[in-house]
Amino acid sequence: MVKLTSIVAGVAAIAAGVAAAPATTTLSPSDERVNLVELGVYVSDIRAHLAEYYMFQAAHPTETYPVEIAEAVFNYGDFTTMLTGIPADQVTRVITGVPWYSTRLRPAISSALSKDGIYTAVPN
């Protein structure tokens, strides 16, 4: 795990690489394809609101992030292979752990999933 401050330098290219799923695909919220879309939105949000993430990190110094995010950020390349394998619970914890999840991230994630034809359903 690494702090957000150590992953900031290369955020720019990460949001571009999520492969689109076929139209009208229904997946579990913990499906890796859903996680990759969520992480793409998350990284894009970090880039767009870097100061807020720095302030959040300063207020929560023990909050850590999966090292794969840092590796993807610093590589500047296709991040999908780097971010595969991050457990769904870690993806959820990182993304929902910021105060702006409900107002900014959740709507952006819903939009990105819909654009890729991905709909989520909680398994019974």
Swiss-Prot record:
Name assigned to this protein: Seripauperin-23
Organism: Saccharomyces cerevisiae (strain ATCC 204508 / S288c)
Keywords on record: Cell wall, Cell wall biogenesis/degradation, Glycoprotein, Secreted, Signal
Induction trigger: Induced at low temperature and during anaerobic growth and completely repressed during aerobic growth. Induced at an early stage of fermentation and remains almost constant throughout the entire fermentation process.
PANTHER family: CELL WALL PROTEIN CWP1-RELATED, SERIPAUPERIN
Record-linked InterPro entries: SRP1_TIP1 (IPR000992), Yeast_SRP1/TIP1_CWP (IPR050788)
GO biological process: fungal-type cell wall organization
Function: Component of the cell wall.
